[in-house]
UniProtKB/Swiss-Prot annotation:
It comes from Ehrlichia ruminantium (strain Gardel). The keyword Flavoprotein does not apply. Binds 2 Zn(2+) or Co(2+) ions per subunit. Its EC number is 3.5.1.18. The gene is dapE. It is an enzyme of class 3 (hydrolase). Homodimer. PROSITE patterns: ARGE_DAPE_CPG2_2. NCBIfam families: dapE_proteo, PRK13009.1. CDD domains: M20_DapE_proteobac. SUPFAM superfamilies: Bacterial exopeptidase dimerisation domain, Zn-dependent exopeptidases. This is Succinyl-diaminopimelate desuccinylase. Pathway: Amino-acid biosynthesis; L-lysine biosynthesis via DAP pathway; LL-2,6-diaminopimelate from (S)-tetrahydrodipicolinate (succinylase route): step 3/3. Belongs to the peptidase M20A family. DapE subfamily.
Amino acid sequence: MVIDPVTLSQELISFPSITPTDNGAISFLSDILSQYGFTCHILDFGDDTVTVRNLYAYRGTEEGPNLCFAGHTDVVKTGDLTKWKFDPFSGHIEDDILYGRGAVDMKSAICAFIAAVSRINFNEVPGSISFLISGDEEGDHFQYGTPSVLKWLNENNHKIDYCIIGEPTSKSFLGDTIKVGRRGSVHFKIICNGIQGHVAYPHFAENPIDNMVSILYKICNTTFDTGNEYFQPSNCEIVSVDTGNTSRNVIPDTIVAHINIRYNNIHTAESLFDIINNICAQVTPKYQLLHSVSGEPFFNQPNQYSDMLSSAIKKVTGQDAIASTSGGVSDSRFIKNVCPVIEFGLKNETAHKIDEHVPVKEIYQLADIYTEFIKQFFNLSTT
């Protein structure tokens, strides 16, 4: 029986799987895929504070390539419920538009690929199709999601040959953008120290704010690069500055700033650390610099599979897709270490927003695109 991707999307949205809580979403998908002949492994990873539920499901033969669809069932918080037109977990359809948290990012894409798979005659598939579904991509415990599943796959001799991720990559219309790489993301914490004192007697104090302002000014006026053929220029944003000082007549002794740099493959996190460190040292010796990396940049050269996806998009929508590396980080930063990866999904305009929504027509189109891609990948009949 062929699955209706919109009905399935409504059902999946009804699970309030706010990261890292699963609330039954993974088991629901496991039950659906089991009915279609998939061997399903529900995988729980975590620590004393949290457990993240994930799913790996596969069907087919080990003789040929394994085409994997990767996604996540966790969603971000809803925000003020009174501002939503409809219950964000009702999967409500109004005027042929599906509303709900996860409608765009990215439950509908998961359902579209499941619908596509339900149309495939597996007797003709010279390989296997699999699903890698994470229960925490949006939150702080992502290490117990896709990275842990990939480790499990390696330990249990499951090999993925190519992966498509259903992140919402489209911008103005469905099919205008596919992701063939991602920028890196590095976060810096800058601490400047001074001497606390009374604002009326500044000569007895040392205000660390002055040095921090100078440091941030230099950073904001630094051209890290001008980009290249595949990536836009690296950019830096100040995300917070705080002294923790609530007194109006006290010069603080410490100030902390957080900055984030989204960077291309001209840099590494360490080369950017050197740049920021040198700027700080030019201003004052009284500083500390810490950094953490969310993901390094990567780029996949166009290949036969990305050409197949572009062809499938063209056939269904009539549009030519643009290959892009823009946007934030995704689980592709982990999967790219295992196999080539590409990302394609719905329009991202309302992702994470109040009244997140998608036209039902585009869910059907996405299922059609995924179906065509699967057929081309395995050289199946496209009639």
